[in-house]
Amino acid sequence: HYAANGAAEGRNATTLISAGEGAQAAIVRGSCTTKFDPRASRATNIAVSASRINGVVIQPGEEFSFNKTILPRTAANGYVEAPIYVSGKHSTGTGGGICQVSSTMYSAMLNGGIPATERHPHSLPVPYLPEGRDATIAGNYYDLRFVNIYNTPLQISAVADLRTGTVSVTLIQQ
């Protein structure tokens, strides 16, 4: 739905990898949608980080790093100060909210049976997913990583909708 109708609904649509003649149709391997307050400062960071992973293609056997794909988290790259968790306490930091995108991706991975090669839980519960389905990102030391276990490319579709306050991540096997 998002890839086909996103532009008509005022969102950035993902262009799926076109299958060559004789190729099989794309298969959704995992998908997840979470909700957020689109008026909160973290909404900006959710939108920026979703746009950075949107359309990324992971080749067979290649490892994807969420951190490397969205870095650097600076004001110059569009990230803003927003609430974060630090060692079990509430704080603020540049990029607060990006973990909702990494957590939504991790939940999509779980839904699709794609194992993480690196994943760290938050130090406090998150309100947008059940316990055990979150994936925190911090500095250059906490990352969400996975290897494309399929024999064809895997594409990430990530859409943050600031009107409805939802972020969706879909993993599509080509």
Predicted regions and their residues:
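Well-ordered beta-sheet/strand-loop patches within structured domains
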Residues: 14-174
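Charge-rich, low-complexity intrinsically disordered regions
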Residues: 1-16
